[in-house]
A protein has these predicted regions:
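Extended, well-ordered protein cores
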Residues: 4-93, 98-393
Length: 393
């Protein structure tokens, strides 16, 4: 994903590499299609103009098809879920564990009633680039502890998830497609076939905005994180550079702040989240620096039960009849995160393995950078899909 494959891989190893690439593409392609503001920001980094104010054209189809092999690199992919019916974070994790991903740590977000695990990509040579860096992103998967919600919100989720065979026995299969396990057929999250009632959605939104997002989007990508340290040029400002592992020029920045400034300036005018009190979230050790855009929005068709005849107590999950109507509502979709992993003190990299030396700075391998995740950072990043960020972002 981040660069050329090591030389002399066996046919079996090449097949493993292609299979994992295809799985990641299966998530990323619909993610970009559903979130036009996210795609525009990614396009700007992939195909920049010659100046910071030049209009940035959309990717042509041929260029879009190259995205997954030529982009400078995803830091991680993130998913949300409910801890129900053998689903939860394990349903998504199983999709990646079969490709060699391994769990490296757990995080707990008490106020949000959420647990998470992060997974490292395969360590095998086939999953690395020619420099030895991981060629595939980390994985961050979380789920909501449904039993910790108020009764009315818990019952909405149990009505949707707890009675659905697809969300249990076949959860991983649906997760592979980024589908909605509790819909009729694991369909595209943007389709109006899921038959979620507006009052159900609002009940969840009031109890947990994480829950409301997950009800609508299921196992779709919550966000992709760009490895900004792979964009860096060790000088001030921004310049256009030709990647060693791509025919495409790309932006390179002196800092995470410079990257954000570029994205926020016209013509992009990207909205960034300030959840947690600031735009850039920094770990206590200073080694992990993160920021995110405000989530895109998606028009979703909900069942409006406000006109249901009095005394009719049937739930939406039992079917839709002539007395119910659809109403459209804009809901938070997905966002893009930007991550800067600083070099570990005393491990600044190897000048003899310096792919960026010509740009004025030594290449620092990924193994010499701050790894993992930080609870406080992630807690704030979660809120990129919250309504307050839509208003204030």
């Amino acid at each position: 994903m981040r660069g050329e494959a090591p030389p002399d891989l066996t046919p079996e190893d090449l097949q493993r590499r292609r299979a994992l690439t295809a799985q990641i593409e299966a998530y990323v392609r619909p993610y970009l299609a559903r979130n036009p503001r996210v795609k525009r920001a990614v396009d700007a980094l992939l195909r920049p103009g010659t100046s910071e104010t030049e209009e940035i054209p959309p990717l042509k189809k041929a260029e879009a098809d190259e995205t997954f092999e030529t982009f400078v690199g995803w830091d991680h992919l993130a998913f949300r879920s409910f801890d129900r019916v053998d689903g939860g974070l394990l349903a998504v994790a199983r999709v990646f564990e079969k490709h060699g991903y391994t769990c490296e740590g757990s995080l707990t977000f008490e106020a949000k009633k959420v647990d998470a695990r992060w997974f490292a990509p395969p360590a095998a040579r086939w999953a690395r680039d020619a420099r030895g860096d991981p060629a595939f992103p980390r994985l961050f998967v979380s789920h909501l502890r449904v039993d910790d919600l108020p009764d009315d919100a818990r019952k909405v989720i149990e009505r949707r998830v707890g009675t659905c065979e697809e969300s249990g026995r076949n959860a991983a299969r649906v997760a592979e497609r980024g589908g909605v396990p509790w819909s009729a057929d694991g369909a595209d999250a943007s389709a109006d076939v899921i038959n979620i009632a507006l009052d159900e959605y609002e009940t969840l939104s009031n109890a947990s905005e994480y829950a409301a997002w997950t009800l609508v989007h299921g196992h779709a990508l919550n966000h992709v994180a760009v490895a900004v340290h792979r964009l860096f040029e060790h000088s001030s400002g921004v310049s256009v550079s030709m990647s060693r592992d791509s025919r495409a020029p790309r932006r390179r920045f002196a800092s995470l702040e410079a990257c954000l400034a570029f994205l926020k300036a016209p013509p992009l005018s990207t909205k960034t989240s300030r959840a947690g009190g600031g735009e850039v979230k920094v770990s206590p050790d200073g080694g992990l620096r993160q920021a995110a855009t405000v989530a895109d929005v998606l028009e979703f068709g909900f069942i409006d039960r406000s006109n249901t005849l009095e005394g009719d107590s049937r739930g939406v999950s039992e079917g839709v009849d002539a007395r119910t109507t659809k109403t459209k509502k804009l809901v938070p979709a997905s966002y893009v995160e930007f991550v800067d992993r600083l070099p570990i003190a005393g491990d600044a990299g190897d000048e003899t393995n310096c792919s960026y030396a010509g740009d004025g700075g030594a290449y620092v391998p990924e193994r010499s950078r701050r790894d993992g995740f930080e609870t406080a950072n992630a807690d704030a990043i979660f809120e990129s899909t919250f309504r307050a960020q839509q208003r204030d972002g």
